[in-house]
Amino acid sequence: MLIYLFEWLSHYFKGLEVFSSYISVRIIMISITSLLITLALGRPMISWLQKMQIGQIVRDDGPQSHFSKRNTPTMGGVLILSSVIISCLLWGDLTSIYLWILILVVIFFGAIGFFDDYLKLVLKHPKGLRAKYKFALQSIFSIVLAIVLFYLLSKNGQMSLSIPFSKSLYIPIGIVIFVVLAFFIINGSSNAVNLTDGLDGLAIVPVVLVAAGLGIYAYIETNSTLANYLLFNYLGNPGLAEVAVFCAAVCGSGLAFLWFNSHPAEVFMGDVGSLTLGAVLGVIAVMVRQELIFFIMGLLFVVEALSVMLQVGSYKLRNGKRIFRMAPIHHHFELKGWPETKVVIRFWIISLILFLIGLAAIKVR
């Protein structure tokens, strides 16, 4: 919205055209805007959640240190999502279909997460939205979206899978493989981030790092000069560069949310935030054709999800025997005696290392 205003004003005031003509400037501005919006609205929202008594539910079989988290305001993810949408409407190119798709993903998965949180925290339904209904909604949306993206992104009905650390190795894939891959990436990422969001600040920092990494890839691949220099396939689809702008909005809002979510957390994002942010990262990875880079950068999320699947499988197949003391795996380390802050910071370090490995693939090819 603002780019059109600055484009008009640039006819009368020299220099303002940088705000409409340069995507790098808009990336900086949208990250600052989303950060400031989240910081400004954070305190009022926390107060409102406290007033409405929308607080965290703590498992009785969890670490004793978690009992102090009971009734901590939850559903703070609404703050992140609202900030991202507002910032995108202000600084995004509203002619980009990819920007609108990402906003639609935020709204749809945000609605699922919001309804799930509302059932658990307000209506006091212990399990919230039933898993089968949640999975069905996620699946239908992901499949439809994958089909749409295939026809938007494909060339002559063909797509390719980029292989990290390789200059020219691309695996051609058709619509069936693409849809199946996108389905697992979007749904898997959504639920993996949701499982990771179990300690103060644990999930939001890896989310910001992965969003930043994918944003860098989006910027490179949609810039013909950079793409050619770094030997990437140039993605010249009109409007696809707005993915980098969207990623910047997620980074800005996520960093500001950490201000309130760091230990001791004043607010949790809830399912409305974690389910949505995970889905958004998955969709972005599919859009910029960097699914394997996403796997590398987001490996922490994968490990968290795998720990739950292994725990459940072991319990069912081995007559109640468990692999971990508690799943997801961050709780296992807590029950081993690691302080919560140590678990979180060590997981952040791992996430940072994975982020750097993912960035190294830009040049080490």
From Swiss-Prot:
The chain crosses the membrane at residues 22-42, 74-94, 95-115, 133-153, 168-188, 201-221, 240-260, 267-287, 292-312, 342-362. One of its GO terms (biological process) is cell division. Pfam families: Glycos_transf_4, MraY_sig1. It is found in: Cell inner membrane. Its EC number is 2.7.8.13. Pathway: Cell wall biogenesis; peptidoglycan biosynthesis. The keyword Magnesium applies. InterPro entries: Glycosyl_transferase_4, PNAcMuramoyl-5peptid_Trfase, PNAcMuramoyl-5peptid_Trfase_CS. Keywords: Cell cycle, Cell division, Cell inner membrane, Cell membrane, Cell shape, Cell wall biogenesis/degradation, Magnesium, Membrane, Metal-binding, Peptidoglycan synthesis, Transferase, Transmembrane, Transmembrane helix. It catalyses: UDP-N-acetyl-alpha-D-muramoyl-L-alanyl-gamma-D-glutamyl-meso-2,6-diaminopimeloyl-D-alanyl-D-alanine + di-trans,octa-cis-undecaprenyl phosphate = di-trans,octa-cis-undecaprenyl diphospho-N-acetyl-alpha-D-muramoyl-L-alanyl-D-glutamyl-meso-2,6-diaminopimeloyl-D-alanyl-D-alanine + UMP. One of its GO terms (molecular function) is metal ion binding. It is a multi-pass membrane protein. GO terms for cellular component: plasma membrane. Its cofactor is Mg(2+). Its main location: membrane. Belongs to the glycosyltransferase 4 family. MraY subfamily. Catalyzes the initial step of the lipid cycle reactions in the biosynthesis of the cell wall peptidoglycan: transfers peptidoglycan precursor phospho-MurNAc-pentapeptide from UDP-MurNAc-pentapeptide onto the lipid carrier undecaprenyl phosphate, yielding undecaprenyl-pyrophosphoryl-MurNAc-pentapeptide, known as lipid I. This is Phospho-N-acetylmuramoyl-pentapeptide-transferase. It comes from Francisella tularensis subsp. tularensis (strain SCHU S4 / Schu 4). The gene is mraY.
